Design a protein with these regions (language model features):
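Phosphate- and other anionic-substrate recognition elements at nucleic-acid/protein interfaces
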Residues: 2-13, 17-132
């Protein structure tokens, strides 16, 4: 069964080496809500992500990919892209990549208590604004 376009749900991930922030939102409202941060690495991270996927049942995933201020790639850019590929391979969901420059800085400037989840919200809202 295909989900009507307006009702599509997305789960955004703000990937970090030790922590991953989450946000959920949908195409209809074009807003995102923070869903906390997990502190896990390796396979343990994917177990925790699977739990979130069962809870939210998103139609697609959105992953923040960091770049230098001038747009150049760096080591974490490659890590985030690898993570996005791993998500697609493990969970068979579409994965969209979003430039996440300054999202954590913006989240902290807004007074976020959980900067990673707040950054995931910003990433998801940027993505939702970019789709028709």
């Amino acid at each position: 069964m295909n989900v009507p376009v307006g009702l599509q749900t997305f789960l955004a991930l703000d990937f970090g080496i030790k922590r991953t922030g989450f946000a959920v939102g949908n195409r209809l409202m074009r807003t995102a809500q923070p869903q906390g941060t997990i502190n896990a690495e390796g396979d343990a991270r994917f177990v925790r992500i699977a739990e979130r996927l069962r809870e939210w049942q998103p139609d697609a995933l959105v992953v923040g990919v960091p770049f230098h201020p001038d747009g150049a790639e760096h080591e974490n850019t490659l890590r985030a892209r690898k993570f996005a590929r791993q998500l697609h391979g493990r969970f068979k969901l579409p994965v969209f990549e979003v430039d996440e420059r300054y999202t954590t800085t913006e989240a902290l400037a807004m007074g976020a208590k959980d900067a990673d989840a707040a950054a995931a919200c910003i990433i998801l809202e940027q993505f939702l604004r970019s789709i028709p």
